[in-house]
Amino acid sequence: MKASVIVSVALGASMCLATTLAELPACSQACLQSMLGKAAELGCPPHDPGCLCSHPDFTNGLRDCTKEACPGENIEKVVEEGQKACKDMGGAPGSSTGAPTTGTGSGTATGTPTSGSGSETTAPPTSGSGSAPAPTSGGHSTPYTTIPAGPTVITSGTNVITTSRPATTLYTEVSGSQSGSESGSSTGSGSESTSGPEPTSATSSEGGSSPSSTEGSGGSGGSGGSETSGSGNGPSPTPSQGMAPKATGLGVAGAIGLVALLAL
């Protein structure tokens, strides 16, 4: 009995489906038949049209297929006929009907929830770098007031000039300290020596005497000579004068006098 009921239901569903497909153009019929065969892809068990027809992707796929492959056809009519085909197959969402010979029955259709996944790409944060002149010795300045922007009116006689003033921020002076040390040393040595006669009045062979000698010949062929020495005192020489020139002068004078005596 049950087998005959199942066969009857299957035959009735096939006849209804054929009727529904006949009401659609050939292009949209192909889309509907294609979507009715995607139960496994959509996660529905075989011979469970209720799961397939209640799946959102069944309707979306039927709509997209008709739009892309069958331009000009009424997409909403194709979707409506697709849902009608599901109902004729016994896949109306939430209900099923038994064979009319055994009465009515109730059943539930189960659907698998779908989950969508997406990805969001967030741009990595960027970093920038810059440089500004740093205050010396660790000092820093801080803003202490801001002059807001506004007009500036300048009156000169009958002339009135209005200009705009930008906002200005005033900063404190750079605070900090500067310290440093400088050290150095300079050493040197030198000697200076001068030589010269000391300003004394002592008689010496340098300051007062100069030997002189003369030689002469006698008429008899003999030879003789005399050597005299003289000494004299004079004023002490100054640092810019030496005593040797004076002594030499005195010696020359003595020699000339001796020659004069011999000539007599």
Swiss-Prot record:
It is a lipid-anchor; GPI-anchor. Its main location: secreted. Disulfide bonds join 27-70, 31-65, 44-51, 53-86. The GPI-anchor is attached to the protein in the endoplasmic reticulum and serves to target the protein to the cell surface. There, the glucosamine-inositol phospholipid moiety is cleaved off and the GPI-modified mannoprotein is covalently attached via its lipidless GPI glycan remnant to the 1,6-beta-glucan of the outer cell wall layer. Residues 94-139, 172-215 have a biased composition (Low complexity). Residues 216-233 have a biased composition (Gly residues). Heme binds at residue 48. The keyword Glycoprotein applies. InterPro entries: CFEM_domain, Extracellular_membr_CFEM_dom. It is found in: Secreted; Secreted, Cell wall; Cell membrane. It comes from the Eukaryota. GO terms for molecular function: metal ion binding. Residues 1-22 form the signal peptide. The keyword Transcription does not apply. Belongs to the RBT5 family. The CFEM domain is involved in heme-binding and contains 8 cysteines and is found in proteins from several pathogenic fungi, including both human and plant pathogens. The CFEM domain adopts a novel helical-basket fold that consists of six alpha-helices, and is uniquely stabilized by four disulfide bonds formed by its 8 signature cysteines. This is GPI-anchored hemophore ARB_01545. It comes from Arthroderma benhamiae (strain ATCC MYA-4681 / CBS 112371). The lineage of its organism: Eukaryota, Fungi, Dikarya, Ascomycota, Pezizomycotina.
